[in-house]
Swiss-Prot record:
Subcellular location: Virion
Major location (coarse): virion
Biological function: Self-assembles to form an icosahedral capsid with a T=1 symmetry, about 30 nm in diameter, and consisting of 60 capsid proteins. The capsid encapsulates the genomic DNA. Capsid protein is involved in attachment and entry into the host cell.
Protein's name in the database: Capsid protein
One of the record's GO cellular component terms: T=1 icosahedral viral capsid
Amino acid sequence: MPPFYYRRRWYSNPWRRKRLRFRRRRLRRPIRKRFRRRRWVRRRRFFRFKRKLRKIRIDQWQPETIRKCHVKGNLCLLTCGRGNINHNYILTSESYVPTSEPGGGSWSILQMTTRVLYDEYKAARNWWTKSNSLLPLTKYIRCKLKFYRSDQTDYIVTIQRTGPFEVTLESYLSTQPSRHLMNHKAFIVPKLGRGPNKETYVKKIVRPPALFQSKWYFSQDIYNTPLFILTVSSCSLDQMYAPQDQISTNISLFSLNTNVFQINNWHKQPYTTKAASTLETYLYCYHNGHEPTQELKWKDIILLGNMTNYTDGKKYNTSGTTPLDLFKTENKPYWGNVFTNLNQDQDVIIYYGTKPKQDDNWTSTAPILPITSLYVECRYNPFKDKGTGNKVYLVPTDSGLGSFLTLPTKSELIITDLPLWLITWGWIEWLKKSRPVAHIEEEYQVVIQSKYIHPQLPCYVLIDKYFRHPPEGQHYITELSETDKLHWHPKYSMQTEQLELIAETGPAAPKINNTKQIEAHLNYDFLFKWGGSPAPMETITDPAEQEKFPSPSNQLQGLQIESPGKPKQYYLYTFDEKRSELTMPAAKRLKKDFTTPTFFTDFGTKDIPLKTQEETDQISEDEEIETSLPKEDHLKQQLQRTRQYYREGIRKLLKTKKLFPL
């Protein structure tokens, strides 16, 4: 048998092998040695080279002190009054609502951060089970959410844990209930009464964000970092397309007669209705029950050229003047506004015409004609609206020489090729958020160009009932605000009711017809770990100097909660203390001023910042030291840096070791 056929044996355990007794062999007569195959086998040794690991494990040492903290509280997701469904609740949650006007909104996009939780704690709306005082490190574990079922409405929720944590126009339009239902990550919280034996809440567990690592962060560094984003939209699943209190899915809209009113600048003095390229046309009226069959004399005329103030106008003093004097700016107190209650009365006829001629006197006949109507009643069918060719844009009310058909030059002020019920849902709210222009409510008006509204007009400037039927007589003194008295003309604040009617016709839009207000809320339970190395001098106090409380001895003192955005340089650590005294570097650090990076937003901490908004740059310590030092010390430091730079350059050229300083 060849040697390479020898069978290898398993290595036995030498510690368990039975050791044989040593015996000496006796001497024998030498004979021819016969062949015996060897029992031992050569051990093959393989040389193995250690390969590079595909991944490495990075460990982080735990802080000396760790406390588990639960942050528990309730959070309002949305509140919406009847007639305000196309608004974002978060943008107006901290605003004052005028008397007898709806507030809130039927949808919201909000973020949850440690800054939000601390603000809620200061407002006494949540509770922290453990104090984070002197513990600058934070580790976010998870959050338990309970979405309670509302008694008035169903609502849809989407939880976002991955970035980017920003909002865009598409984010606002996606809150429309029919589009929100198409999100595969969305879930529905049905209202009470759907399944009487079901739980009264929907429970969800939210893990940390996708890019978070299982490590300790400084609380200041994640102060503004969103833990997750909630998108909430109320909806009507039982009135998906048709409201119960209406007999049709079509709605009636009232638009300004844009065949008569063509110029959008209401601050023009006196106001002309036609475009600048045509002959200037003015508006006139007669009071005191003037009959249309009578002759129209300039002496009885009232010029309706003041479209800013709420005034009816009055007759001009004809002694020693001509009709052309009425158009001078100093005679503005005699001008009237066509949109007052008196001038919009059915018995008052509004006329349009040109200026009087140079040779006309007060007894001359005025060449003016009556207009058909100030407003046009229109009908809108949401099922007919395909979105093709629709244009909705903003035009200013106090500037420009163009007409309502003039499109804005800014692309942010126009939106096209979408259904009107979708545009009116979130586009205006996006403009309030992104702010391409300021003072939208008072200085801009919404213009619609669409072929899905009947009858056809060049464009539509929708007007609310409050503007079409203003307070009568002296009642306007108390009912109108000072802003309305000085800016009584079509503007966005006088169009919100009509735009809300269009938004309500959208699929699954909430129908608030059985109550005056709807609301939705949740209960949250955040789990954090606070960590740090608090200095001993902060925990030891002389017993003789302890404060004595007049309350009973069994009453516990409240926890001391610090803002998570407190700069980490203000904390005292174990290495800051030596022999029960504060070290010099610690004292120098505490004397400096540090700031916490924040986001600039005017809508509260729950509102999500825009994509263009960035964190405020924090000044580095080196720059602070340089600015605080005198000029001479600053020059010395600069000289020392330059000297060190040249030393390094010389070492690289010589390519020698650093054996002695240069």
